[in-house]
Amino acid sequence: MNEFIYPEARLIAGVDEVGRGPLVGAVVTAAVILDPSRPIVGLGDSKKLSEKRRLALYDEIKDKALSWSLGRAEPEEIDQLNILHATMLAMQRAVAGLHLSPDFVLIDGNRCPALAMPSRAVVKGDSLVPEISAASILAKVTRDREMCELDLQYPQYGFARHKGYPTAVHVEKLAQFGATPQHRRSFAPVRNALLDAELAAAVARTL
């Protein structure tokens, strides 16, 4: 990792999100305060790690961190607030869920949610800041597992494979089967699938 200059603070939490781009499911966030006396080797951007390595680190982070917490914003909240504001809300929830209150919070990206303590946004923080890397891993493993569970409920969409992202297969299945209750209605491919279904139903009624 490149050298990162930390703020002067005792308890530093890293925060990251997973799931802003998918058409289905919650956006999931995590907040992590690492224990300097129990270092975790191999932390990195969760998207660049193998699934096997991610799962091993997931268990190690939960075991060794001073405090960790998950937050989320559901599809209904995403549709109501928009994805940016829903993500900020989910980050606030993750920080609020920590059983230790951090002195400073480092957020992956270029924007910070409103928090009770000082914070800083760190572009590419998931590859620069171990606390953010740890949060990224917790959030991704959690959300991927939720997509696998949703796949069992709706196997025809292939959620376990594409994790809800707008792949050609996912968009094709949306057109074929329509939207599930977990789909984000405000996202264009879902909205278009719903409109097409309404139009087809209206045409069918005239026949």
Curated annotation (Swiss-Prot):
Residues the record lists as binding a divalent metal cation: D16, E17, D108
InterPro entries: RNase_HII, RNase_HII/HIII, RNase_HII/HIII_dom, RNaseH-like_sf, RNaseH_sf
Catalytic activity entry: Endonucleolytic cleavage to 5'-phosphomonoester
Disulfide bonds: none
A Pfam cross-reference name: RNase_HII
Residue ranges constituting the RNase H type-2 domain according to the UniProt record: 10-199
Single GO biological process annotation from the record: DNA replication, removal of RNA primer
Cofactor note: Manganese or magnesium. Binds 1 divalent metal ion per monomer in the absence of substrate. May bind a second metal ion after substrate binding.
Alphabetically ordered keywords of this record: Cytoplasm, Endonuclease, Hydrolase, Manganese, Metal-binding, Nuclease
Keyword set includes Manganese: yes
HAMAP family: RNase_HII_B (MF_00052_B)
Similarity annotation: Belongs to the RNase HII family.
The protein's name in its UniProt record: Ribonuclease HII
Native species: Erwinia tasmaniensis (strain DSM 17950 / CFBP 7177 / CIP 109463 / NCPPB 4357 / Et1/99)
Lineage, opening ranks: Bacteria, Pseudomonadati, Pseudomonadota, Gammaproteobacteria, Enterobacterales
